[in-house]
């Protein structure tokens, strides 16, 4: 394997950061290909905990090249705050270890302002945005009015683009939403400062990444969010603004589809989601509360409590199909220890029919009634398990059901947040 993808197979928060960190040990390059600082990854190394939002998880190794791809929308302020945070924890970040695509689009102050204003204007029909300016930045990208990193570091180009764009944005902010206009000079001077700090990191990442692949280097593509937050295949409109599935790698990192050899879907042993939208297996009872507390299900970026539910195999089967997954990595199976009975969803009942896929219509998904298969749980903690045979028989049966239903093998099992609480049970 020379180029493989790690992506979320549910609604995000599956443990991609930990899995990327684990798999990055044998990689030469780690590439982030979409999203922005709305993502949150937690990685535990020894006694230290690192919270990452923009920078690839490979940064915690000294010998990896980390890449922020053109599919990412970059908030320079957030980037340098994260760099300062990591350096305060002893992580060295230099242009030899981190490069940023010259084609990545830049999140500007008006993107954050518009994100918040529009969300408030939706009232009780809000979509649960993080308010980081991600959606408005991707909107400008599609409308061909965005500012890219290569534009930002060219002073004259940036000056002209900012003048044109800010004039339009201020009209929208003031005349449509009744907000206060943003000051051109303030933004211009602030972002010129970012431009100079960014300049040493900026490269044509497609050229570099493809050369690494051609030279036989191990390249890991790190996704953010999850399959059901994908702009096309997610539970629209309660989705993110980028392509979170395997196909997003080609666009977001400038590589061809034939370069990808493997795709690993990260899945919790149960299901969670943040914000609004249908959730067929949601547990609105004491069991759901118990899972939330035991699994520490609160967002890294927002701090919001996550909604919790039984494992939904329909979602995993859909993710495997859409992204061509070669295997799953199952996380947080240790959280389920102590439950007498476990349920997994093996189908939906919709309008009198049984289906095994996620329907496009939000209204149809809201009507779907889960069909469950029950499994006996296990009492003992499995946090100290270090190989497959250490797992309880019932946990192995649970994992086998995932494989059989999705027709996709489970290659990795995680039983805790630390690096050594991870077992590779087959090739990915």
Swiss-Prot record:
Lineage top rank: taxon: Bacteria
Localisation: Cytoplasm
A GO cellular component entry from the record: cytoplasm
Catalytic residues, chain numbering: 13, 41
Cofactor note: Binds 1 Mg(2+) ion per subunit.
Positions annotated to bind IMP: 13-16, 38-41, 130, 144, 225, 240, 304
Swiss-Prot/TrEMBL catalytic activity: IMP + L-aspartate + GTP = N(6)-(1,2-dicarboxyethyl)-AMP + GDP + phosphate + 2 H(+)
Residues annotated to bind substrate: 300-306
Residues annotated for Mg(2+) binding in this entry: 13, 40
EC number(s) from the headed UniProt entry: 6.3.4.4
One GO term (biological process): 'de novo' AMP biosynthetic process
Main location (coarse class): cytoplasm
Cofactor(s) essential for the protein: Mg(2+)
MF terms (GO), sorted A to Z: adenylosuccinate synthase activity; GTP binding; magnesium ion binding
One Pfam family named in its UniProt record: Adenylsucc_synt
SMART domains linked to this entry: Adenylsucc_synt
Residues the entry annotates as binding GTP: 12-18, 40-42, 306, 332-334, 414-416
Pathway the protein acts in: Purine metabolism; AMP biosynthesis via de novo pathway; AMP from IMP: step 1/2
HAMAP family listed in its UniProt record: Adenylosucc_synth (MF_00011)
Assembly behavior: Homodimer.
Recorded family membership: Belongs to the adenylosuccinate synthetase family.
Functional note: Plays an important role in the de novo pathway of purine nucleotide biosynthesis. Catalyzes the first committed step in the biosynthesis of AMP from IMP.
NCBIfam families linked: PRK01117.1, purA
Protein's name according to its UniProt entry: Adenylosuccinate synthetase
UniProt source species: Clostridium botulinum (strain Loch Maree / Type A3)
Gene, per the UniProt record: purA
């Amino acid at each position: 394997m020379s180029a493989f993808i790690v992506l979320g197979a549910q609604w995000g928060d599956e443990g991609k950061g930990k899995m990327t960190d684990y798999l990055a040990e044998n990689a030469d390059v780690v590439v982030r290909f979409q999203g922005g600082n709305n993502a949150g990854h937690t990685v535990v190394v020894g006694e230290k905990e690192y919270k990452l939002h923009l920078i690839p998880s490979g940064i915690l190794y000294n010998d990896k090249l980390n890449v922020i791809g053109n599919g990412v929308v970059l908030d320079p302020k957030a980037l340098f705050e994260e760099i300062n945070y990591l350096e305060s924890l002893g992580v060295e970040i230099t242009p030899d270890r981190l490069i940023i695509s010259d084609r990545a689009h830049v999140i500007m102050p008006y993107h954050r302002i518009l994100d918040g204003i529009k969300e408030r204007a939706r009232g009780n029909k809000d979509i649960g945005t993080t308010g980081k300016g991600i959606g408005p930045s991707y909107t400008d990208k599609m409308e061909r009015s965005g500012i890219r990193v290569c534009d930002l570091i060219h002073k004259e180009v940036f000056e002209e683009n900012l003048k044109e764009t800010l004039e339009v944005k201020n009209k929208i902010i003031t005349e449509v939403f009744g907000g206060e206009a943003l000051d051109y000079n303030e933004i211009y001077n602030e972002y010129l400062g970012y431009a100079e700090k960014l300049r040493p990191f900026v490269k044509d990442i497609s050229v570099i990444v493809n050369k690494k692949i051609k030279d036989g280097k191990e390249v890991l593509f790190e996704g953010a969010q999850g399959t059901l937050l994908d702009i096309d295949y997610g539970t629209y409109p309660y989705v993110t603004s980028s392509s979170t599935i395997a196909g997003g790698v080609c666009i977001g990192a400038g590589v061809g589809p034939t370069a990808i050899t493997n795709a690993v879907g990260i899945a919790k042993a149960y299901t969670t989601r943040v914000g609004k939208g249908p959730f067929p297996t949601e547990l609105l009872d004491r069991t759901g509360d118990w899972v939330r507390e035991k699994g520490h299900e609160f967002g890294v970026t927002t701090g919001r409590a996550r909604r919790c539910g039984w494992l939904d195999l329909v979602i995993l089967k859909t993710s495997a199909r859409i992204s061509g997954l070669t295997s799953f990595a199952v996380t947080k199976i240790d959280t389920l220890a102590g439950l007498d009975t476990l349920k997994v969803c093996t189908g939906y009942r919709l309008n009198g029919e049984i289906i095994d896929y996620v329907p496009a219509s939000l209204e149809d998904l809201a009507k779907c009634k889960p069909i469950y298969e029950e499994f006996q749980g296990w009492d003992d903690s499995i946090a100290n398990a270090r190989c497959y045979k250490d797992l309880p028989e019932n946990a192995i049966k649970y994992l086998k059901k995932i494989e059989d239903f999705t027709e996709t093998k489970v290659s990795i099992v995680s039983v805790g947040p630390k690096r050594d609480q991870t077992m590779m049970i087959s090739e990915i």
